[in-house]
Amino acid sequence: MTNTVNYSTSNSTASAWTGMVPVDDTALYVTDTGGSGVPVVYLNGAYADHKHWRKVIAELGPGLRHICFDERARGKSKQSADYSFEACLRDIDAVLDARGVERAILVGWSYGGVLAWHWTDRNPDRVAGVVTVDSAPYGLTGPEGAERIRKLFHRMRFLLPLTRPFGMAARMSAAEHAEVNIELNEIADASGPVLERLRRPVRFVVATGNSLGSEDGEMEKARTSLEPVFANNPNVVLSAKVSSNHSKILSKDFPAIADAVREIAA
């Protein structure tokens, strides 16, 4: 069915474009390679900028139309009064509408993967498929989880500005970073039913080992939460489990991610 539907609002080739897309009280930095290929929209990790996708995009090549953007207060985008998950979902609307994209493949890493599930659940006719990179329906929840996350970001408060130029932190306070993460954990943990009802092809590429702030074995426990989803929804498939960790998966295992995108785009 995906091969019989136009991916954009026009049959003409889209022009390459870089600029700012206004939404709510802010503006998002967007890059669009243009072309006549299937649009692929990349959704970043919670505090990451679009540059982390460079190797994946280079591996896929110019046959696809690659659209990246920086979320609010990340990368080159402007700050906002609203950094909520719902605001991030609205940002996907704004970017696709601004670029005239009717239907796309969503590729999301970590936070971006959870965004992709929920946006697809709400907009199934606008999504050809989803590639999820090391996200899972699992999270640190409740008061204990929230307190642990707040303590982590409080300890990191002096490090965050130093990592920002490398696309690893946002122009937010440590407390704002923590609140983004607390909300993500609550939403991710409740997302199993969302994944189980998706009717678009969803491919997972998952990492191995731990990530920043996780306890030993915690990330592998999170990844096992996908097993019931794979069993209950044939549209959701494990494409690859790779050797790199959560932080390095885009830079080290980009070929596996590209293969999953090609499978959806075929």
Regions found by a protein language model. Name each.
Residues 105, 128-131:
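Residue in the alpha/beta-hydrolase core beta-strand immediately N-terminal to the catalytic nucleophile
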Residues 26-78:
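Conserved HGGG/HGGXW glycine-rich cap/lid loop of the alpha/beta-hydrolase fold
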Residues 117, 121, 130-160:
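Flexible "cap/lid" loop of the alpha/beta hydrolase fold
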Residues 55-58, 67-107, 111:
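Active-site loop/oxyanion-hole signature of alpha/beta-hydrolase fold enzymes
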Residues 208-244, 253:
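Conserved loop-alpha-helix segment in the C-terminal half of the alpha/beta-hydrolase fold
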Residues 165-202, 206-215:
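Hydrophobic, aromatic-rich cap/lid helix
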Residues 70-74, 136, 244-245:
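Short beta-to-alpha linker loops that shape the active-site pocket of alpha/beta-hydrolase fold enzymes
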Residues 249-262:
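Post-His helix in hydrolase/transferase enzymes
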